[in-house]
Design a protein with these regions (language model features):
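A solvent-exposed, acidic/Ser-Thr-rich amphipathic alpha-helical stretch
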Residues: 164-206, 212
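Hydrophobic pocket/interface hotspot
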Residues: 158-159, 166, 242
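Short, solvent-exposed coil/turn elements at secondary-structure transition points
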Residues: 50-53, 172-174, 228, 250
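Alpha-helix boundary/capping residues
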Residues: 31, 162-165, 202, 263
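Short, flexible helix/strand-to-coil boundary loops that buttress conserved ligand/catalytic motifs
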Residues: 36, 162, 170, 260
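Active-site-adjacent scaffolding segments
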Residues: 1-148, 154-157, 161
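C-terminal regulatory/effector modules of DNA-binding transcriptional regulators
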Residues: 199-263
Length: 263
């Protein structure tokens, strides 16, 4: 395998790569770590929460759908809470089935350090994901009922659907802290009562959010609001024991434009 690397006066030079897989993994891993460090710094600077892009698996087709079927929005959000190094070790070990020695060479860390990072990542994900499982039918029922209740501003009904310690996360974009005329939406809303009150206020101030379309995102039931033929918001949840534990609302147009919106 040949690779182009920058040389003098902006020209590239060709080098032979003996181990293409290792070279590609190292290059991509380094680029991802740099981007993660940069993204983490941007999030801290903006003091807002960002959500991963919702993924329409139907647009990928084939093996990709099967491989990504278990990557729920809740799991991707949990991954974001790991440090870049923890995330890299977890994915390289679990997805690419690399040994600790291979990962250590890639990240320039000792095997012991990689084992420790993997252990921390697994422990964190296990503690956060514990109990966040429900049947697809129950998941869909809770989602549709919650979307209807929130759209109509029905606080009492929302309270019957939300867990007491539920969390609402709204991503309005890298610079946005406003939803319509409602300010300060860059931080999660904690607790069922606060979430219901907040969404009731949204329903009063933004009565025509668009047409609600049921779809599947990240392998899970979801609802996308469509306005003038374009996605305006995507709503996903995680649930356990018959109650909604997390509500994820993506309204950043830059992270919605790729959705297929198939009928």
């Amino acid at each position: 395998m040949s690779s182009r690397r920058p040389g003098c006066a902006g020209r590239g030079r060709t080098v032979e790569v003996d181990a293409p897989r290792a070279f590609l993994l190292q290059t991509v891993t380094r680029l991802c770590l740099n981007e993660l460090d940069s993204a983490r710094a941007r999030r801290e600077e903006s003091r807002g929460d960002r959500l991963p892009e919702p993924v329409d698996l139907g647009l990928l087709g084939g093996d990709a759908v099967e491989a990504l079927d278990q990557i729920s929005m809740a799991f991707l959000v949990l991954l974001q809470r790991l440090t870049p190094a923890e995330r890299a070790v977890l994915l390289l070990h679990e997805v690419f089935e690399m040994s600790h020695s291979e990962i250590g060479a890639l990240l320039e860390k000792s095997e012991a350090a990689c084992r420790q990072l993997l252990g921390r990542a697994r422990a964190h994900l296990a503690s956060e994901r514990r109990g966040l499982r429900t049947s697809r039918e129950e998941h869909r029922r809770l989602l549709l009922a919650f979307v209807e209740a929130s759209r109509n501003g029905e606080m009492d009904r929302m309270l019957t659907l939300l867990a007491e310690d539920a969390t609402l996360v709204i991503d309005t974009g890298p610079d946005g802290k406003r939803l319509g005329r409602i300010r300060n939406v860059g931080r999660p809303v904690e607790g069922a009562t606060r979430i219901a009150a907040f969404l009731a206020a949204v329903a009063r101030q933004i009565p025509a959010f668009g047409e609600a379309r049921e779809c599947v995102l990240n392998g899970e039931p979801a609802v996308v609001y469509v306005r003038e033929g374009r996605p305006a918001a995507a709503i996903l949840i995680s649930a356990a024991e018959g109650r909604i534990r997390r509500v994820f609302v993506q309204v950043d147009a830059g992270r919605l434009g790729h959705l297929g919106l198939r009928q």
